[in-house]
Amino acid sequence: MRKTRDAQNVSEGITIIVDAFWGDGGKGLISAWYALLTHASGVFRGCGGPGAEHGIFYNGKYIKTNQLPLGFLMTGSLVGIGPGTAVDPEKLYEEMVRFKLEPDRVRIDPRCPLVTPLDIEEEIRSAHMRGIGSTMSGTGACMAKRVLRTAPLAEEVGYLKPLVENIPELANKLASEGNIILESSQGFGLSNFFGSGKYVTSVDVTTGSVLAGVGADWRKIKRVVLVVKALPTREGTGPMGNVEEFTVEEMLEKGIVEYSSIRDPQTGKPNIRRKAKGIDWDILKRASDINGATEIALTFAEHYDKSVTDVTKWSDLTPKVLNLIKKIESVTGAPVTIVNTGKSFNSLAWREGTPEFTNVEEERLGSYIPA
């Protein structure tokens, strides 16, 4: 029988989940498990918009969100969207219906800027947006209008009023009484502040901006979990540090191809993500320092070493993966506490044991899969 971690041993406050590289590292999966571990009463988005896809696999089916944070999936927690996040009302309501979320469980800040159909059309017409691997969600165009103070706000739209609430007040109240999760978007390498030139997203996505985007009190932070993908990937163009990339043929041969949610506009087929052959340690060091990482979640370890596929015990991790963990800890100064080893939501090896996963959580996940 595996040891489980007791939420009573996890002090109340804020857990922030951020990605070290260019996204697609499994933030949503890690957020969902930390929400379960800490018995989080709220899961919040604090930056970005409806473009960045967060998802997990359950019984071979893919469960994803674009607008909502994914961390609520295994808990009955409240779902919140802070003023730092752009909201597409159509996607918001579609996800509420799909996940059977009643209006009293979803809260958005009155100051959230709203994505319009014109924002989406503007991005679709942009050759630059196609080149950098944009999801064409309209988030960038919406945020540009926000800077110009011309974007519509949630408080101005009548049908959104049942969902509108002051998110800073709500988040800080919940963090004082228990635990909450703040879920970032994309990754450090795509930060508008710290990424590479024009090959970035429309906002900053680091710990500081997620915190500000929710309006949460920094004194309530208990942990910052930095998600480190064993073999980092990137959508579209832009540098990936001083590390050689796999060719598509090499990825196919090794069975480590990752298909994107972004499709080729001409063929309609999913793009294949670019994949580095290792970690650029200078980038990881910067990501750790700027985000203030207190612990590390290592993801996609099975792409680094197939021998650990679906391993769920720390003692079963291979020397190759354990050596990678040592190097990551040496560079970041933070412990690796969890290793993701496969596609399934529970392909995880916890250093201190596994959070208890009961029939309640399993039934909840199962309810999200269409019959």
Residue ranges of model-derived segments:
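Non-transmembrane, aqueous-exposed alpha-helical and coiled segments at domain scale
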Residues: 2-371
